[in-house]
Design a protein with these regions (language model features):
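The feature captures the beta-strand-to-loop junction immediately N-terminal to the Walker
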Residues: 28-30
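Helix-to-loop junction immediately C-terminal to a conserved catalytic motif
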Residues: 43
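Conserved ABC transporter NBD signature motif
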Residues: 51-59, 68
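Conserved ABC ATPase "signature" region
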Residues: 92, 107-125
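Conserved ABC ATPase signature
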Residues: 104, 129-133, 137
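Catalytic Walker B motif of ABC-type/P-loop ATPase nucleotide-binding domains
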Residues: 154-158
Length: 232
């Protein structure tokens, strides 16, 4: 039962949800409904005013940061990194929960980095600076970093926003591959309802800071829902 607000204005109102292991779970809803705020609370970026987020029965707020990072990766919508950092260096950051900052990469770490770049199809970009990549290439590199982290759960905040349609589909196909090939649990925020319908096992539809409905896409993407939630 998570609640969150700013300056007395409620943003999330008594939110309760559960995520089944091995599923792709997508949060949808109109702008300002609290989707990204909810994802930030799940990932511990924001602290709820009441309620708690549990991972296998343990409150994530009390978890050791490195231990939590070994289990859960987050890809925010806005990312800051030195533009001259190479793709390979960025993906190597995903190993820091295992090695510690400044820790030397072992052969296993290097193999994980190579595997992640291969899965994302960016091996040929390994020596390119992040600042020289297209938006789609950059997003694939960031997702590869999350994969190198070897978590059980990946949280993605609007991973297809501002990308050309071809890269949107590549990103979502990669997300599906991570779910199926690595049994990773995916929780993501999406704006595009068609993409949510195609790539999700379970959808949480939000309206005005609350969960409006949840279920398989075919069960909740109904005309009356679109009218009530999206006013279309």
């Amino acid at each position: 039962h998570v609640c969150y607000g700013i300056d007395g204005v409620p943003i999330l109102k008594d939110i309760s949800l559960g995520v089944q292991k091995g599923c792709i779970v997508t949060i949808v809803g109109p702008n300002g409904c609290g989707k990204s705020t909810l994802l930030k609370i799940i990932s511990r970026i924001l602290r709820p005013q009441s309620g708690e987020v549990l991972l296998d029965g343990c409150d994530v707020r009390t978890a050791n940061t490195r231990s939590l990072a070994r289990r859960m990766a987050i890809l925010p919508q806005r990312k800051n990194v030195a533009v001259d950092l190479t793709v390979e260096q960025l993906v190597q950051y995903g190993r820091y929960p295992h090695t510690g900052f400044g820790g030397k990469l072992t052969k296993r770490d290097i193999d994980k980095v190579d595997e992640a770049m291969h899965a994302a199809g960016i091996e040929t970009l390994r020596n390119r600076a992040i600042g020289t990549l297209s938006g789609g290439e950059s997003q694939m590199a960031w997702i590869a970093m999350c994969l190198a982290q070897a978590p059980e759960i990946i949280l993605l905040d609007e991973p297809t926003t501002y990308l050309d349609i071809c890269y949107q589909l590549e990103v979502l196909e990669l997300v599906r591959h991570l779910n199926r090939a690595y049994a990773m649990t995916i929780v993501m925020v999406l704006h595009d309802i068609n993409q949510a319908a195609q790539y999700s096992d379970i959808v949480y539809m939000m309206k005005d800071g609350e969960i409006y409905n949840t279920g398989a896409p075919k069960d909740i993407f109904l005309p009356e829902s679109f009218t009530d939630v999206f006013r279309v």
